[in-house]
Amino acid sequence: MEVTDVRLRRVNTEGRMRAIASITLDHEFVVHDIRVIDGNNGLFVAMPSKRTPDGEFRDIAHPINSNTRSKIQDAVLTEYHRLGELEEVEFEEAGAS
């Protein structure tokens, strides 16, 4: 299984969420609402979840092994950092005009 596409939108919120992503797996299956969170130990990826009646959050979809989790996290965070670099370049170019 490979992550074949990542669509990411940065968000400006008061909380720790930094972006929301959708990934495509093997050009065949899409998972929406993956969140990039700024945790105590750096950025991490949180899978889509919903709140249960007792207030807990349960993942709607999630990888079942650490290798797959790493592939997803690496792909999403790579795109997150790539977009950050693009925004910095665009900001610098706009300031240079």
Swiss-Prot record:
InterPro entries from the xrefs? SpoVG, SpoVG_sf
- Which Cys pairs does UniProt list as disulfide-bonded? none
List keywords of the entry alphabetically.
Answer: Cell cycle, Cell division, Septation, Sporulation
| Annotated GO biological process | asexual sporulation; division septum assembly; sporulation resulting in formation of a cellular spore
Q: The organism sits in which domain of life?
A: Bacteria
In terms of HAMAP family, this protein maps to: SpoVG
Q: Which family does it belong to?
A: Belongs to the SpoVG family.
Function summary = Essential for sporulation. Interferes with or is a negative regulator of the pathway leading to asymmetric septation.
Q: What is the designated name of this protein?
A: Putative septation protein SpoVG
* Native source species: Bacillus cytotoxicus (strain DSM 22905 / CIP 110041 / 391-98 / NVH 391-98)
